[in-house]
Regions:
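Primary detection of the long, small/polar-rich alpha-helical "axial" segments characteristic
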Residues: 1-177
């Protein structure tokens, strides 16, 4: 019983760590989403056919800076040195005391190239409209990634509750023996 209790305790710690990782990933994804919303505003502004070439260029420069910020966020969203949202994060968390009690997680890439927003052109009304569509697609893609992280967090919370109950029950039995 003592070994089981210790195993459950370590599993709870693993689950807590996994939840922390998912929180960091979700925060990174959300920061990218905030920029996507700003990009959508800028592209909508640039699609106004009454803008001058200089105005479009200024908006284009802002867009370029925002896209660079997306890539910076992706590069900087890390946990214990591991990049989380650049498409390379694929780990298996030990979520229980048994050999098969694990959860495999692979997080999506949210850099500008993966979201197809790395080459937005706002130089004309028509191109700005195309950019709006690309940004809408990126928002949809990223929304799915955020939802997947939310689902993982929900599974981890359920597992954490089950482990806590099992640990409490194990300790109760152990104390009566």
């Amino acid at each position: 019983l003592e070994a089981r209790g210790k195993g459950l305790s370590v599993a709870m710690s693993n689950v807590s760590n996994a939840k922390n990782i998912m929180d960091v990933a979700e925060g990174g994804f959300q920061n990218v989403m905030d920029i996507l919303h700003t990009l959508k505003e800028k592209a909508t502004q640039a699609s106004d056919d009454s803008l001058s070439a200089d105005q479009r260029t200024a908006i284009g420069n802002q867009i370029t800076a925002l896209i660079e910020e997306v890539d910076d966020i992706v590069a900087e969203t890390k946990f214990n040195g591991s990049a989380l949202i650049d498409g390379t994060y694929s780990k298996t968390f030990q979520t229980g005391e048994g050999v098969t009690d694990s959860l495999a997680v692979a997080l999506n890439n949210s850099d500008s190239a993966a979201l197809s927003i790395n080459a937005l052109d706002l130089s004309t009304h028509a191109l700005a409209t195309v950019a709006m569509g690309a940004i809408d697609s990126a928002i949809t893609t990223l929304s799915t990634a955020i939802q997947e992280v939310g689902d993982i967090k929900s599974r981890l919370s359920s597992k954490e509750t089950a482990l806590s109950v099992a640990y409490t029950n194990t300790e109760a039995v152990r104390s009566t023996v």
